[in-house]
């Protein structure tokens, strides 16, 4: 059976050090068009999600991650130790499954960029063409990862700087020039438009996109154990991360919202739409650079998808180690890649992609369903995280931990309940059709989302019920936790949701 090796960690991580290894989560260029559909109220949604959801998740996860004996294993360990192994298995499974669905909006973005580069609209509009192209890209990227992930983090680093950060700053700079020139702005930015129209329930659905942009912070909570002064520095780091996320996402989303009217934004290709308008206004003589920028964005998101393929499966591998999965899922190839877990995840992605793209028309509705489905699946894990934390506070107050949410038991419960209630609210509004989906499409939106969710929801519980956990997988694999001292180069440029929590050690070779 696989074993886990504990490694000592020097308490050397400072406030800025922790911020640096977590900051990659605040850049999500492919979500900017979705943000933009809410106009100036996107700032309100970002503040709401940051204060009522991001901060509670970060604080609760940090306290659980520093409980003696719970330092490794993440949400699986926390939920298993508070609610039981069945729920721990479900929680980590939902993290694994949400990545499978989360690939779909990213692939749609890639196809949107490709359609601009190749001047091939069908690639972004025709469902069959879109499906075939997305499947080819997905499995081609998977093949590059089966050979091992030695260079994955470095590729992700290059992709982050050249394909995410650089285009984002170009977008913001062009938008600033556009605004300064006195060009027409597609939205109003004042105190009235700051708040969404609460009388229109459909306008609230976009909140799920803002929740998604904050998801994954719990994956970095294990590094709290490495901080020299977690009680002081960790809450400040969370505040800095929230401010950075709000500032960058606000400016990025508004750069699109003020150029493209909300009802004309293409969620897959909205960034390229905006670059086209901005460049034609600011520097029409070099409008050809839009295709170059599109190529950078394409490479950035391709690098991101590639880097997300193996990491979550390695995280899920801990359940095979605990005999919660059939022995086949514990199999590794010679390069330390859990191929059965990776292939299973990609099969789920492929099936969902085919269904959503062809029944949803391959347009904004397909994108929105994939986005909402990703969120509701992941929220199921967060329900268990918050409930598990409440159990920890009420039933295990004497367990030693390095970090405590300040303020005592009452404050701890308030933080957890606020996070849980916000999660429930986000979960409910996810199933409401957005305003830009009208007529018969609203029924299709709800039906597709509900059925897809119920199928995915059932998977972990069915597998847990039918699997004989007495069988043992003899893999000869050792798991070595990754920390800030031994992490591979470029590891922290991966989004926290996509990072592998441990090395795979086989035959004395670390993967």
Curated annotation (Swiss-Prot):
Residues 1-14, 63-93, 149-157, 222-239, 313-335, 388-412, 467-511 are cytoplasmic. One of its GO terms (cellular component) is plasma membrane. Involved in glutaminase-dependent acid resistance. Exchanges extracellular glutamate (Glu) for intracellular gamma-aminobutyric acid (GABA) under acidic conditions. The ability to survive the extremely acidic conditions of the stomach is essential for successful colonization of the host by commensal and pathogenic bacteria. Shows pH-dependent activity. It is a multi-pass membrane protein. Coiled coil: none annotated. It comes from the Bacteria. Signal peptide: none annotated. InterPro entries: AA/rel_permease1, APC_superfamily, Glu_antiport. One of its GO terms (molecular function) is antiporter activity. GO terms for biological process: amino acid transport. It comes from Escherichia coli O6:H1 (strain CFT073 / ATCC 700928 / UPEC). The chain crosses the membrane at residues 15-35, 42-62, 94-114, 128-148, 158-178, 201-221, 240-260, 292-312, 336-356, 367-387, 413-433, 446-466. Belongs to the amino acid-polyamine-organocation (APC) superfamily. Glutamate:GABA antiporter (GGA) (TC 2.A.3.7) family. Pfam families: AA_permease_2. Residues 36-41, 115-127, 179-200, 261-291, 357-366, 434-445 are periplasmic. It catalyses: 4-aminobutanoate(in) + L-glutamate(out) = 4-aminobutanoate(out) + L-glutamate(in). It is found in: Cell inner membrane. Keywords: Amino-acid transport, Antiport, Cell inner membrane, Cell membrane, Membrane, Transmembrane, Transmembrane helix, Transport, Virulence. This is Glutamate/gamma-aminobutyrate antiporter.
